[in-house]
Amino acid sequence: MTLFSSISSISNPMTSSKSSISSFGSGTSMGSNTVACGGGCGGSGGILGLGLGLGLGLDLTGGSRSRGACGGNGGNRGNGNGGMGGGNGPCCGGCCCGI
């Protein structure tokens, strides 16, 4: 699997404004609480919520939510859960294309 990312303009994580995020695979996540469905499963979140289709759920802002290959919800904990792991993700076993 080939993943590529292009990081756009990023707002200050300490502010409430959330700007463009990043694009992964064929999906793009733009703005606050938007879903990117690229690279298997996307991520939803704030300033730099990353969702990679490799079972990774990364939350770099502490306020965004990101979902990996099988659910997980970072919320304000600053942690996204990927892989076959838990969290509060609404879907497991398919592409997470919704909040």
Swiss-Prot record:
Residues 1-29 are annotated as: Disordered. InterPro entries: HssA/B-like_chaperone (IPR050533), HssA/B-related (IPR008455). GO terms for biological process: sorocarp development. PANTHER family: HSSA/B-LIKE PROTEIN 1-RELATED-RELATED (PTHR31059), HSSA_B-LIKE PROTEIN 1-RELATED (PTHR31059:SF5). Belongs to the hssA/B family. This is HssA/B-like protein 41. It comes from Dictyostelium discoideum. The lineage of its organism: Eukaryota, Amoebozoa, Evosea, Eumycetozoa, Dictyostelia.
